Amino acid sequence: MEIIIISLCLATILAFLLLKPLLNRTVAKDNLPPSPWRVPVIGNLHQLSLHPHRSLRSLSHRYGPLMLLHFGRVPILVVSSSDVAHDLMKTHDLKVANRPRLKVIETILNGGREVVFSPYGDYWRQIKTVCVVHLLNKKMVQSFAKVREEERSVMMEKVEKASSDSSPLNLSKLLITLTSDVASRVSFGKKHSNEASMSDFKNQVRKITELVGGFPVSEYIPCLAWIDQIRGLYNRAEEVSKIFGDLMDKVVQEHLDATNKPTKDFVDILLSFERQSKDGIEVRRSDIKFIILDIFLGGTTTTNSLLEWTMTELIRHPECMKKLQDEIRGDATNLTIYRSHEEVEDMKYLKAVIKEGLRLHPPFPLLVLRLLTQDVKLKGYDIAAGTQVITNAWAIQRDIVTWGIDAEEFRPERHLDSPLDFRGTNFEYIPFGSGRRICPGIGFAMALVEVTLANLVNRFNWRMDARLSGDEYDLAEATGIDVCRKFPLIVFPSNA
């Protein structure tokens, strides 16, 4: 009899434990955002494709712009409209300013001691101040104008050669070389293409991007942690972190050994904070390498993606290309003269073209994950602390409610009389994010994008190989957190 009673008690307890989540969900379901049915253990992961920004938009069309998913055991709030983004990143910005602590990122990035993934707090505020005030301010951006001009000239010579030979040009490769070399010279004082060590640095950065953009199964489904072990996720993270750290240690030591340098790069400036603890801010030697990594990734990924996609859209829309060429060329008779930043900074159609490129192809379609640190009420729904937040900028910027029935079309004219800007105050248009976590390097990226695009369009006419065109080829996206073209942009430039 005692055995039966004990068995019944155990069965009751077990049933309660198993049914408790269902009971809780039933009681609270009226206060939770809409959510698709989820599979035990994996949650809603089976509903994601290789391009999650697209599959999440499809789900939002069915369940609404504020949607609750589960990646394994972790609740994920998906934001797909501007009004929800406004409430989240303005009204509740402080409550959602943190980042999830992911082991793979902390393994690579020294515990997350940099700008993008660092937890919100005093340290993050300090290093963001360093970046915004001392590295990426307007004066610093202007001081590197000569670097941009020199690397632009190198690029233009390569395009000129392809034009003279009537040979195909891999514009994607040329643009990533340009952006990498500019970022390298600004950060380290030298560029990738000149030294083997810098080429190795570039390779490690690519590996870091792939690891950060991957899905760490163990973080969301602990019982499947063996999958990460089999694919060697954390071993690769430790390996790339060590190799990258060793490379950066050499760079830092070279800067410490150098004397009487005529110009200061970012490493020099960061080292001055380590030596002097300037403005009450302390930057450790070990932190410098990862702050530089943030700047390098932001300076290459964002800029390259924007240039590549905007050139793609211009070539696909010859009427837009002609309007831009007419604006840039104006009454000039000598089109071989390079256009300076001062000449192009007030060109309205150029800015409209760039804005439209960013609207359709934001460099990071899904903004970097945020973590809710307090319970909030959002659009009448109760959202619990500990929920991770995905903002689908790609979906927001193609929303027909905001942008009209032609939201999927490349039409720069929509920006000519529009007050919308990408500085984070217009939530219909957030390619760089918004609030405390907005990208601090917008000015740095735009300075290179404007002058590069203007000179490519001014000096040459462009066409694609007819065999390598069409939407399936032109607009196919690669996988990863930074969505660039799946296929390289192969073009034929000709002298204007």
Curated annotation (Swiss-Prot):
The keyword Chaperone does not apply. GO terms for molecular function: heme binding; iron ion binding; monooxygenase activity; oxidoreductase activity, acting on paired donors, with incorporation or reduction of molecular oxygen. The chain crosses the membrane at residues 3-23. It comes from the Eukaryota. Its EC number is 1.14.-.-. Heme binds at residue 439. One of its GO terms (cellular component) is membrane. Its cofactor is heme. InterPro entries: Cyt_P450, Cyt_P450_CS, Cyt_P450_E_grp-I, Cyt_P450_sf. Gene3D superfamilies: Cytochrome P450. Keywords: Heme, Iron, Membrane, Metal-binding, Monooxygenase, Oxidoreductase, Transmembrane, Transmembrane helix. Belongs to the cytochrome P450 family. PANTHER family: CYTOCHROME P450 71A2-LIKE, CYTOCHROME P450 FAMILY 71 PROTEIN. This is Cytochrome P450 71A15. It comes from Arabidopsis thaliana.
